[in-house]
Amino acid sequence: LKKSLFLVTFLALVPLFLCEEEKREEENEERQDDDQSEEKRNLVSALIEGRKYLKNVLKKLNRLKEKNKAKNSKENN
């Protein structure tokens, strides 16, 4: 009777352990997916900010270029 009780208990616990292991693996995968999604969002945000900064730099350079053109044309006249 003890052997059969042990066997039944063992056979009941094996699937439980397997389910727990599978659950942990799924949680790890979800965490990795969340981390990757966050990294992508951060990268996109950084690219957008970099684009804005570059756009402002180009505007300032164009203004300086126009000022230099105006200055040179006044000097030539």
UniProtKB/Swiss-Prot annotation:
Q: Which residues form the propeptide?
A: 20-39
Tissue and organ expression note? Expressed by the skin glands.
One of its GO biological process terms is: defense response
Q: Which UniProt keywords apply?
A: Amphibian defense peptide, Antimicrobial, Cleavage on pair of basic residues, Secreted, Signal
Q: Which GO terms describe its cellular component?
A: extracellular region
This protein's record includes keyword Cytoplasm: no
Q: Name its cellular compartments.
A: Secreted
Organism superkingdom: Eukaryota
Q: Which residues form the signal peptide?
A: 1-19
Protein's UniProt keywords contain Methyltransferase: no
Q: What job does the chain carry out?
A: Has antimicrobial activity.
- What protein family does this chain belong to? Belongs to the frog skin active peptide (FSAP) family.
The protein's name in its UniProt record: Distinctin-like peptide
Organism, per UniProt? Pithecopus azureus
Query: Which classification does the entry list for the species?
Result: Eukaryota, Metazoa, Chordata, Craniata, Vertebrata
